[in-house]
């Protein structure tokens, strides 16, 4: 049997945020079995905790219902909060296929309620199919250059003129299936406060409640295009349109086209626990 918990990541109470199933002690499971278990859970991601291979506290494998990811934000944040309940450490180092990700844990009355992660610094480039993407989204243009960032997953960013326009968005999900290995992030806002929606049929997710791996790149995108200064933390509210409000906090350090650090943080709340009879 394998014990698991479900953590609602980027939420301060259950039934909000983005849920992730965290399975413990998974060294006996094959990748194929993990994939089938993730499909059975049918959450946007499930994680599997294994013994570390290097100097970390644990090695983490991340699966959507359809594929394995080298890195993802909300699953790792939820996993760090779940593992924090098993230890009195204030810092954790989780090994992923994108390297070891450090976490700082925040406790209240001994309980882990939030954490921050240092994310991999992404690469970025102009997106090669902007007209087709805009057509699939039902948009005529973007308020920012349409660029794609890679920090494991590939995130493309499209800016809208207002939060109202963002909320009214009804993309053609069948057309979005023509963009393999891509998460489509639409955003609007100003200053420290931003709203986001993410669509990714390619990753088995119609619409995501909270996309932690996109939060850092969005902070970089805004800083590169001089909408915020480097070093300023932004709040990203996501999941409102699907009834799962999620709050992510992101900050990028750097200057111009050089990024030196990316930090993403948020709360997490335990929703359920159980055992898989495998």
Swiss-Prot record:
Quickly give the catalysed reaction: (5S,6S)-6-amino-5-hydroxycyclohexa-1,3-diene-1-carboxyate = (1R,6S)-6-amino-5-oxocyclohex-2-ene-1-carboxylate
Q: In which pathway does it act?
A: Secondary metabolite biosynthesis; pyocyanine biosynthesis
UniProt xrefs under Pfam families: PhzC-PhzF
Active site (record annotation): 45
What EC number(s) does its UniProt record assign? Answer: 5.3.3.17
Summary of the function given for this chain in its UniProt record = Isomerase that catalyzes the condensation of two molecules of trans-2,3-dihydro-3-hydroxyanthranilic acid (DHHA) into the phenazine ring system. The final product is not yet known.
What GO molecular functions are on record for this protein? isomerase activity; trans-2,3-dihydro-3-hydroxy-anthranilate isomerase activity
This protein's UniProt keywords: Antibiotic biosynthesis, Isomerase
Q: What is this protein called?
A: Trans-2,3-dihydro-3-hydroxyanthranilate isomerase
- Recorded superkingdom: Bacteria
Q: Which GO terms describe its cellular component?
A: cytoplasm
**Which protein family is it in?**
Belongs to the PhzF family.
What is the native source organism of this protein? Pseudomonas aeruginosa (strain ATCC 15692 / DSM 22644 / CIP 104116 / JCM 14847 / LMG 12228 / 1C / PRS 101 / PAO1)
